Swiss-Prot record:
UniProt entry keywords in alphabetical sequence: ATP-binding, Cell membrane, Cytoplasm, Membrane, Nucleotide-binding, Protein transport, Translocase, Translocation, Transport
Membrane topology category: Peripheral membrane protein
Cell location: Cell membrane; Cytoplasm
Top EC class of this enzyme: translocase
Listed HAMAP family: SecA
Chain residues that bind ATP: 84, 102-106, 496
Name of the protein: Protein translocase subunit SecA 2
UniProt keyword Calcium, yes or no: no
PROSITE patterns xref list: SECA_MOTOR_DEAD (PS51196)
GO process annotations (BP): intracellular protein transmembrane transport; protein import; protein targeting; protein transport by the Sec complex
Gene: secA2
SUPFAM superfamilies noted in UniProt: Helical scaffold and wing domains of SecA (SSF81886), P-loop containing nucleoside triphosphate hydrolases (SSF52540), Pre-protein crosslinking domain of SecA (SSF81767)
Source organism: Staphylococcus aureus (strain MSSA476)
GO cellular component labels: cell envelope Sec protein transport complex; cytosol; plasma membrane
A molecular function GO annotation: ATP binding
Amino acid sequence: MKHKLDVTINELRLKSIRKIVKRINTWGDEVKSYSDDALKQKTIEFKERLASGVDTLDTLLPEAYAVAREASWRVLGMYPKEVQLIGAIVLHEGNIAEMQTGEGKTLTATMPLYLNALSGKGTYLITTNDYLAKRDFEEMQPLYEWLGLTASLGFVDIVDYEYQKGEKRNLYEHDIIYTTNGRLGFDYLIDNLADSAEGKFLPQLNYGIIDEVDSIILDAAQTPLVISGAPRLQSNLFHIVKEFVDTLIEDVHFKMKKTKKEIWLLNQGIEAAQSYFNVEDLYSEQAMVLVRNINLALRAQYLFESNVDYFVYNGDIVLIDRITGRMLPGTKLQAGLHQAIEAKEGMEVSTDKSVMATITFQNLFKLFESFSGMTATGKLGESEFFDLYSKIVVQVPTDKAIQRIDEPDKVFRSVDEKNIAMIHDIVELHETGRPVLLITRTAEAAEYFSKVLFQMDIPNNLLIAQNVAKEAQMIAEAGQIGSMTVATSMAGRGTDIKLGEGVEALGGLAVIIHEHMENSRVDRQLRGRSGRQGDPGSSCIYISLDDYLVKRWSDSNLAENNQLYSLDAQRLSQSNLFNRKVKQIVVKAQRISEEQGVKAREMANEFEKSISIQRDLVYEERNRVLEIDDAENQDFKALAKDVFEMFVNEEKVLTKSRVVEYIYQNLSFQFNKDVACVNFKDKQAVVTFLLEQFEKQLALNRKNMQSAYYYNIFVQKVFLKAIDSCWLEQVDYLQQLKASVNQRQNGQRNAIFEYHRVALDSFEVMTRNIKKRMVKNICQSMITFDKEGMPVIHFP
C-alpha cells in the first residue's frame, strides 16, 4: 500500500514538472534559430531582467534552461534529454533528484547551475572527491564560458599545496565553483578565522548542488571537520590503562552494546580499577583523568576494529569510512580516542591537539540559502532527507527501461561455503567472456579474493579506494570482454561502466556482491554499477550466517542461529525454509543497522545544536568587528562599563590594593596609584573611576597611532584576538564535554540535556570573558612598525 502511495505521489510531482518541460521545449524550438552571438547575449539579458525585478529565477527557468540546453549542444555536442530536464527542475526547486547510474547527472546539473549563477551570488557544485570535481569542472567549463559566465575549481589540484595570500579569493571569485564537501567545509572554517576583511575569501553560500547527496549529508552527516590548534596537556596514561583493560572480562568487569557503540564498567570493574591504580574512589574529582582514559581504552579495545574502522598504515592509524569503505588519511578521532587506539596497537602515542574550529557536514549545508542533491538511491533515505533538511525526493524516470536482472540472494551456512560457491560462479562467468565486478565490504576481503583469482589464472584489477583517479580509469574499463575487477564498495564511485564491444550479447556486466552492506542504499548503489542506460546486466548478493552484518547487528536468538548453522549440509541445500530464515535474519540485521545509523545521526544533530548556534553568534560578532571602519568615532564606553560592573560585583570586598592590581592587570601598566578620591565602598564610584582610567588609556593608544587607518586596524585586531582566544577555548571545551557526557551517562536524553545545560553555562561565561579580554586588549596591546612601515601588534 505504501509503495503504491509513493508511486502515486511521485507521478503527481512529475506531472507538475512535465508542464515546465513543455515550456522549455517550446523555448527550445525558438532558440535553435538564434545565432551564436544572439544565444550568448541571452545571459546578459537574463541578468538585466533579474536585476530590474522584471523576472525571478523561477520565471526565467524555462527560457534559461532552453538556452543552456541549446548551448550544450553547440559547445559540448550533448543535448539534454527530457528526463535530464526533469532532474534539472527538481534541483532548482531545492529537492533531491533520484537519477539512476548513467543518466547524465553531470550534464543535468549545468542547467540549474547556469540559472542560479545569473543572480551573481555564490553557486556551487559539490561532490565527494577531488578527482570527480576536477573531471566535471574540466568537462563543463567550456559551456559556462561560452555562455558568458566564469567557472573555477575551488582548489589547486596539487598535494599539500600552500596557498599564497589572495589566491583563495581568486579561486572563489567566479560565478560557478566546483569543489568537494571536505574542501568547502574547511574553507568555511578558515574563512571565519580571518583577521581582516581582506583575508576573507568565501562568497555567499547561496545555492549548491550536492552530487552523491545521500553519501554526504546522510552517511557522513555527523562527520566533524576539525581545524586543530595548539597541543593539549597530554596524559601519559594511555599505555598503562591499555594494560589494565587487557585484564578485564566482558560481563564481569564491563558491559557493552556494540550496536550502540556503548561500553561501561560494572561494579567489579570499578573495584578492579581502584585496586590496580590504588585509588580510593574511581569517580572522585581527583581520578577523573584516569576514568576518562579507562573509558577511552575500553572503546578503543572493543568498539573499534582493525581493518574495519581503521588500518595501521606506514606507522599511522588511518581511519576507514564504515559506510563507503574509503580510507580517510589525515583524519583523526577527537578527545583522546585516536591516541587510545594507537596505544591499543602498541604504537607511540601522537600528540592530541586542541580544536580551533569545527563543523559537521549537516550544519555546513544548512548554511546555504538553498541546496539540492543528486543520487541514484534517494528514495530509500526520503524520510531522513525530509526530517533533517525538509527535502523531498523525486524519482526521475530513466531514458531507457532498466534491463538489469537483480537475482535473488544466494544463501549459505558458512562464509567458507559461500566463498567456494561464489568463486565457482565467477569462474563460470569469466569463461564465457562476460565482464565481472566483484564487490566486497572491506579492503582486506578484496585483496584476498584478488589473490585467489590470480592463483586460478584469472588476471584482475584490484580497487580498494586508495587512488581515486587511477581507480576511476580502471572501473571505466570494467565492462570490457573478459574483464575481472575486484573492488570495495566505494572504489571508482561516480564513474560509469560502459560495455565494450560484444559484451551486450553476452548479457552485460555481472556484479557479484560478497555480502549485504550495513545500509540498503549502498546495496542498491552496488547493483546499479550494472545496467546503465538500458544496458543488460545482472547482480547477485551472496549471504551466510557468518556475515559481518549478522554477527554485528542480528538480534535473533543465538541458539536458533547455532541450530541453523549446525544443520546437515545436504538438508540445507534443499531447504527453502532455511533460505527464508537466513534471509529474514540478514534483512532484520540490516534494518537494525540502518535504524542505529539514523539514531546516531539524530543524536549527533542534537549535540551539534549548541555549538551550531554558538558558532553562528560568534561568527556574526567577528564579522561585525571586521566591518568596523571608523574606530576613532566608536564609543567603547558601554563595553567597558559592562566589564567593570562584572569586576565590582564579582569581588566580595573592594579594597584599594585590589582595584590598583586590577588596573595594572587590565588597563594600564603606568598607573600612578592615585586613588585617594575613590570611595571603595561605593561600587558605582569604583566603576566610574575605572571608566576614567579606561578613557585615558584609550586616548593614549590613539595618540600613539600614526593615523586613523592604523587605529582602525589596531581595534579590529585586538577585538578579534579576544573573540578568537575565547572561542577556541570554548570549541575545545565543548568537544571534551561531549565526550565526557557520553562516557558518564548511558541515557541519551539525560546526556543531551546535560550537554546543552553545561554548554549554555559555558557560553555565557565565554561571552563575559570576551568582553573582559576586549577591554584588556584594547588598553594593554601595543603597536609597533616594522622596517617596511607595517603595523605589528603585541598582545598582553
